[in-house]
Structure formats: structure tokens, C-alpha cells
Amino acid sequence: LLENIKKVSINVKNLNEFLDKKVFEIEKHDGENRIGQVNGLAWTSVGGDVLKVEAIKIKGKGELTLTGSLGDVMKESARIAFSVIKVLIDEGKIKIPKKMILDPKTNVYDSYNLHIHVPDGATPKDGPSAGITMSTAIASVFSDKKVRSDVAMTGEIDLAGNVLPIGGLKEKLIAAYKADIKIALIPKKNYERDLKDIPDEVKDNMKIIGVKDFDEVLKYALV
């Protein structure tokens, strides 16, 4: 049997042939502000990542469509986000352009269907930490305001609009730094508790802001 064993030489050039892993790269943001497109921060098995969240509105009856291989918890977060934005619209905190009002007797969010998508659809995604990211995408769509491309965020949101703490902060902020993000919005509790664990290189080159509610998120995210 030993005679049939062949020697294999592994070096830098052929290493990828023996690794069953994709090369993990984080793209830098392109500098273009867009309506309904937000940079979220995610934790993965190979480190942090910048997760794009997209939202569009289509004339309809207030239905919500979710795509991108989202898990149950993330779908729940999207529904919570939509409810939070509805409340903010009703309270007048999110201003709706006149051109978007199809029927003055109908709530604007009942005149459109909303579609939220998280690209890289073949990759399963789950967890509550994209709550403020999805909320920002929806707010952008209904206010017709663009989202800053140099801002990224992570945080769970509840029905009262409070921003709740998340896990994997160190990895997420390192990913934001690699993507050339200038402002990272994180839950205030994480800011107070976990900022000491973040590398100085990240803290020195990126503004990290702790937010306690969604009103603060909008102040930094929309232009």
C-alpha cells in the first residue's frame, strides 16, 4: 500500500487548491449615496462583514416582501422595522414628500408594497442585529432621502424604536474599518461596555457613535 502513496507539495501558489474555503474579502464603499441602500454590519464564522440591505417601494396595498435567504429572526426584525417606521410617519417624525401621497385619505405606507432584499441570496442570514439597518432603508424609501454610503450600522430595534445591544462588535467594527467606513453607529450599551475591546487603529480612523434610539440613527444616516 505504501508504494501507491504519492507525495504532494503544498506551497503559496497552490494553497487555495487544498482549502475548501472562499477567499473572504471586504469591499470598500463606493462613495455614492443612494435611496434605500444601507450598510449593515454582520458577524460571520470567518469574521465581520459589511452587509448591504436594500429596500424599494412599489404601488400596492402595504404588503411586505423579504428576500435574500433570511432566517425567521431576521424576518421578524424586518416586520418590527416596518412597524416602527409606520409609527414615525404617523407622528410626523418622518416627512413624506407630496409626490408620494397617492390618496390623501390613505396612509402612505398602505399605498405601496415594500420589498426588502439582502444581496448574496445563496448565503443564509439570520439574527436581530440588522434591525436598525432595515429600519433606515425603509425610512429612506418613504422620505425619499439618500443614505450616506460612508455610514455603517448594527443594532437590534424594538417596537418603541429603542436600539438594543448586539454581539460580535469587535469583528463588525474591524470589517467597517476595512470597508473605509467613516461613521459606525452601534447600540449605546455596546459603546459603553465594549469599546475598550476595539483595536486603537479602528477607533483612531473611524468615528464610532453609540445610539440609544432610532431618531439618533436617522440624524446620522440620512442626507
What are these regions (language model features)?
Residues 4-16, 21-39, 45-223:
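Peripheral, non-AAA+ core regions of ATP-driven protein-machinery
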